[in-house]
Curated annotation (Swiss-Prot):
Protein name: Transcription antitermination protein NusB
Coiled coil: none
Gene3D superfamilies: NusB-like (1.10.940.10)
Function in brief: Involved in transcription antitermination. Required for transcription of ribosomal RNA (rRNA) genes. Binds specifically to the boxA antiterminator sequence of the ribosomal RNA (rrn) operons.
Organism of origin: Rhizobium meliloti (strain 1021) (Ensifer meliloti)
Source taxon at top rank: Bacteria
GO cellular component, one term: cytosol
InterPro entries (alphabetical): NusB-like_sf, NusB_fam, NusB_RsmB_TIM44
Keywords, in A-Z order: RNA-binding, Transcription, Transcription antitermination, Transcription regulation
Amino acid sequence: MTNTPSDQPLKQVNQRGAARLAAVQALYQMDVGGTGVLEIVAEYEEHRLGKELDGDTYLRADASWFRSIVAGVVRDQRKLDPLIGSALQDDWALSRLDSTVRAILRAGTFEILERKDVPVPVIVTEYVEIAKAFFQDEEPKLVNAVLDRIAKQVRGDQRK
C-alpha cells in the first residue's frame, strides 16, 4: 500500500514563522492605516491568528512572539530606522521603500537586535521568505543584503 498525500501527516506549521508573517502584516497595516499597536494586536489575536476570516483560515501563530515583534518594533522604531538606513545603499532612504519592505526590515532588525537566542541565519531566512511571499526578485535580495549588513554590524562575524 502506498501513501497518498492525504494519508501522510501534515507538517506542523512553524508557529514563529507564522507570527513573523502576521507581525509584518500588522506593521504594514499600522504604517498605511495609522492603526495603534494595542488595537492591531487585539485585532490579530481575536480575529486572525489561527482563525478563519472571510473564508480564509490564518495559520496558527505564536501569539507571544507576534506581540513581542509588533510591540518591540513600535517601541524601538527610533533606534531601528537609523540602523536600517545605514545598511541601505547611499542613494536610498528608508522612506523610499515600499511599506511592506519597511515592515519586513523593521521586524527583522528588531529580532537581530533583541533575540540573541535566535541564530542570525534563521532570522534572515525567515524574513527573506516573507519578502518572497510578497515580491518576485529585487525586494527579497534587498531584505537579505540589508539584514545581513545589520547582523554583521550588531552581532559581528559570529552569525549566531
